[in-house]
Amino acid sequence: MATAATEEPFPFHGLLPKKETGASSFLCRYPEYDGRGVLIAVLDTGVDPGAPGMQVTTDGKPKIIDIIDTTGSGDVNTATEVEPKDGEITGLSGRVLKIPANWTNPSGKYHIGIKNGYDFYPKALKERIQKERKEKIWDPIHRVALAEACRKQEEFDIANNGSSQANKLIKEELQSQVELLNSFEKKYSDPGPVYDCLVWHDGETWRACVDSNENGDLGKSTVLRNYKEAQEYGSFGTAEMLNYSVNIYDDGNLLSIVTSGGAHGTHVASIAAGHFPEEPERNGVAPGAQILSIKIGDTRLSTMETGTGLIRAMIEVINHKCDLVNYSYGEATHWPNSGRICEVINEAVWKHNTIYVSSAGNNGPCLSTVGCPGGTTSSVIGVGAYVSPDMMVAEYSLREKLPANQYTWSSRGPSADGALGVSISAPGGAIASVPNWTLRGTQLMNGTSMSSPNACGGIALVLSGLKANNVDYTVHSVRRALENTAIKADNIEVFAQGHGIIQVDKAYDYLIQNTSFANRLGFTVTVGNNRGIYLRDPVQVAAPSDHGVGIEPVFPENTENSEKISFQLHLALTSNSSWVQCPSHLELMNQCRHINIRVDPRGLREGLHYTEVCGYDIASPNAGPLFRVPITAVIAAKVNESSHYDLAFTDVHFKPGQIRRHFVEVPEGATWAEVTVCSCSSEVSAKFVLHAVQLVKQRAYRSHEFYKFCSLPEKGTLIEAFPVLGGKAIEFCIARWWASLSDVNIDYTISFHGIVCTAPQLNIHASEGINRFDVQSSLKYEDLAPCITLKSWVQTLRPVNAKTRPLGSRDVLPNNRQLYEMVLTYSFHQPKSGEVTPSCPLLCELLYESEFDSQLWIIFDQNKRQMGSGDAYPHQYSLKLEKGDYTIRLQIRHEQISDLDRLKDLPFIVSHRLSNTLSLDIHENHSLALLGKKKSSSLTLPPKYNQPFFVTSLPDDKIPKGAGPGCYLAGSLTLSKTELGKKADVIPVHYYLIPPPTKTKNGSKDKEKDSEKEKDLKEEFTEALRDLKIQWMTKLDSTDIYNELKETYPAYLPLYVARLHQLDAEKERMKRLNEIVDAANAVISHIDQTALAVYIAMKTDPRPDAATIKNDMDKQKSTLVDALCRKGCALADHLLHAQPHDGAAAGDAEAKEEEGESTLESLSETYWETTKWTDLFDTKVLTFAYKHALVNKMYGRGLKFATKLVEEKPTKENWKNCIQLMKLLGWTHCASFTENWLPIMYPPDYCVF
């Protein structure tokens, strides 16, 4: 057996499938039509130029002609210009950069910038490098440092049992070192590499250098030109293996560092056009084709596509005159075939004859799950994913060869507007090249992301042959050839495979044989605002319906007017279904002609029905249809009270990959459904997909979608629940996973439930006190247990600034149509550490369908450090923020300034997640709610019965800090008592806040005692004059005023406090340290410390004016602590900055030494006195405690206080103090990592979009 297995040849042809599409046979017939002369734009995560198979074409040309990042994720602001001094430049990182002597720079000026490597490293690479850096750079050194600190602490504890003040400090010092090292380990965070970037003009072209070694020795770094000039690229190191190229824009003011954002793009490019001269069996479909790599997946957004990236990409596609675009991306869209991005795609296709191939989506098996643009845009060829038996063996190592099938997850049509959705299918899996940074040569990936480049490569072969033979083609003729020659698989439905599996050789023959003018045209089919007839809801199929269909020819861009005039086409219209009636003929000229189609679905059985009305040129009927009108009808099953609103199926047989669809008319009043699946097989565990979709106009399918991938064990049971909309048809799909082996039998039931609330969203205003909502059990007996949970508070922001400007050279559409940006700036305060979700309500959830080019927000802290970013789908971009002030910058782009100006006051919201959820009390009648008595628990509601509920307001002390008027709390209302019902039937709740109650302060100054005598005006004047003099004393720096006031008011404490603050705040403070000490002593001497200590020791104060006394005592304590700290800081500064005098007399030296000892003794006394009154980590005391530690050379204690100072005031100077102490302690690894954080935490400006 083993011998037979090893002798069987390895199925190389199944690793990257070409046989199934006819690509292999085509290349056997025409080996030179291997993609030569064809340029494919790969719009993806970027292509690694160093990956296997990405170097040359079959005819020796560069495989990748250019590499462009259109997202802006690799952009570096290099607007700062500097000139070297002595051959050196100080980079924005603070490193000294040595300019090599052999660099040519006639102007002598360099543009400099800075970039954190983790800003553009792919996520997987970043995680790997972080792990490796910790293991190699941090852990070994840190373990030694921690062990040494623990050893010292233990030795001290053994040797010293005394509790003297000196020993106490030493013990604290050693303990601090251990605590700090443990804390650094817990808080370890790798800033990643920080690269200085230089750009200059050498007299002929722009050049760039990235200090990839981070040591300033630029002679060892790679100098690069724009990639398209010489196909140059560099690498960030042997550990990273991350290849990069550059592009320089705006006269050197902007550098784009281009890296791959993920492995996806390289894999896609390898499928389409990889070439291995030594291993041709590993070649992609079109090894002779060239590639234009365009990165549209923004690394900042986990490689999500953005409007900015896509529109810039289409500009590049047009400028490079690309023949093909492969786009293995897409999202669900609320309305198909519309939006700014789709308009630009249409322009590239219709006007510039670029064939746009895209993935249909990976959201099957339900119908109408095609993504945008692949399955929803008329100009785009959407490709479904097919899996062949050879692929199953070679790629997936299945034990058995199963019949060819569509992958379970491949998206299905039709589009929501009736278009077929999927155009063609191709193999949806491959083992192909991936970037070097993955440390793999190849990888298995599957998806319509893989079927699209397989089809795209096949089309490249066709175009290569057409170009070699000078055969004209258009996007319309090529698409028609693909669709009319594709092979339909009998066991795969039309909505999955489209017109069938692409056949390269047959499509080529078709185009060679059919060269008529009519075949070069496109035809737009419209049914009102739709592109097909799609009857899905019960009301649409209840009676026959007539549909007006418009058919209009689309001419290639450069068609002569004479050809348009002479155009006359005689068409035969056919339909192969009896339930559709259409005209038999149509005469078409250069205008839109309308026909009427009648659809009568009344006699159709339950389920799905599809047909087409096809238009044939009577002159060449064998060429296949010139256009098709797709018609889909869904006949839904009904459930009623007699069946308890259940739909049951028993002992249902499933083969591998088999799909069963059930269309059900959801009963009016149903709000959720429960599906129960039970296995009847005792020997086979099975993988199933449960999928349900309801379609609502102008809502993406994902808005009302349920999806669950599950493993069903032998004789096992699974129960799931999902929300439904009453009165509309729902598709419930249960599918056996495509790779499952053996057959299996199951029972399953779909059961509908309904608890209807009066409002689809509950809006509660706190001022109303009590809010009512009513509930009805609409179908059957239901157990109720209403519960309102609030999980976040939402803050609304208005822009503090709005700026509009024209964008750069990358943002000019054909015919010099300039794009503009508006940048809106918002500010908000984060009251405490927590998770936030920023979003722009007007624009969010819109991407391809948006009328604006893009939306991108970036959030910054008060030091302009980038904290996070997001775009169209806010739920994907939650982030954690510490307490502090933050700025949000939102970029919106459009071609028209007037449209941007309308948004200059655009609101923005920040949703703050509550650390603990809040609940609102719910009562069953108004009286109980009014009195705050018995709350509702649970009850059983019979069918059609109503029950009112009353919600009371949230107590004021529960309102989260920072929330106030203009904010609201967001959460949900659940009504069902069952866990499944709670999970599925959820009603949104908004609780709108009002101003907090006014609180009267204790010890109010307005409260006068009866015994207190009013001050006369003269006394008031004298006091006011005194206070005015004190105020001006600090401004004028006048000692005379102080002396005068001291004589007049010798016991007035605020005078001495003001004098102390005045001296301590002076510019020449260091020269007046002794005066500060004297001033502090004066303040201290005027406070009765005994009385203060006695007051603090009191447990309660029974006196009637206790609040006033407390206020006075608190002020005295604060003043005392402040004076002690200022005195201590002055004494410490005196010791820290004392300089020895060379050549000083012996007597002077002795005097200095005695003075120093006296000062040190005074400092120690002040320190211990301070500890009597307050904690050393009090904000006021931290600076003194820090300086006291420095004087005593206790750097562990100093660092402990310094880190606390950073937490209170995270300035660059405070961080530098920490770094200095780390170095003094010998913790160079901690210092190094912290130093690397500084340019990230304190960037010179906001990062560019």
Curated annotation (Swiss-Prot):
Location relative to the cell: Cytoplasm; Nucleus
Modified residues (N6-acetyllysine): K401
Entries under PROSITE patterns matching the protein: SUBTILASE, SUBTILASE_HIS, SUBTILASE_SER
GO molecular function, one term: aminopeptidase activity
One Pfam family linked to the record: TPPII_Ig-like-1
Residues of the active site: D44, H264, S449
One record GO biological process: proteolysis
Biased composition (Basic and acidic residues): 1003-1018
Modified residues (Phosphoserine): S915
Keywords assigned: Acetylation, Aminopeptidase, Cytoplasm, Hydrolase, Nucleus, Phosphoprotein, Protease, Serine protease
Entry annotated with the keyword Acetylation: yes
Keyword match Isomerase: no
Chief subcellular location: cytoplasm
EC number per UniProt: 3.4.14.10
Domain Peptidase S8: start-end pairs: 9-508
UniProt region (Disordered), positions on chain: 998-1018
Further comment: The limitation of proteolytic products to tripeptides is achieved by tailoring the size of the substrate-binding cleft: the two negatively charged residues Glu-305 and Glu-331 that are blocking position P4 limit the number of residues that can be accommodated in the binding cleft and thus create a molecular ruler. At the same time, they orient substrates so that the tripeptides are removed exclusively from the N-terminus.
Function: Cytosolic tripeptidyl-peptidase that releases N-terminal tripeptides from polypeptides and is a component of the proteolytic cascade acting downstream of the 26S proteasome in the ubiquitin-proteasome pathway. It plays an important role in intracellular amino acid homeostasis. Stimulates adipogenesis.
Protein's recorded name: Tripeptidyl-peptidase 2
Organism: Rattus norvegicus (Rat)
Gene of this entry: Tpp2
